[in-house]
Amino acid sequence: MNIEITESQFKKMFFSIMNILFPNIEYSEKQDGNKGYDITSDGEIVFRIYKRGNVNELFIPENTIKTIIDFIPQVSKKPRLLSKLISSFINEKTGLEIFSVEFWMLDSDGNLIDGNLMMRYNYKQ
């Protein structure tokens, strides 16, 4: 039996899983001198936003990507969808509009793809 899942259904499921994986999302201005925000869940930094002028760029640390792929291995095959969903999730939680998303892409086993594949997706021109 083949089951079709729409993008909106997948987004709803993804947001539910993200709320379980990263409860109590909070953000604060970075303390290391760089302009931007640290986004934490239960005190642990799970995302970083860097400000370049008026633009917010989201960086997703490797351990955060690994956690997400461990729960939803299918997203390792769709990095553009993954970045779009994470951007929407962060926007909903913080109200910060994301211009681009950067992350190291991992396969479903948690290994770096091609050794060092940095994915970067821009949303607004």
Regions found by a protein language model. Name each.
Residues 1-17:
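Short acidic, low-complexity intrinsically disordered linear motifs used
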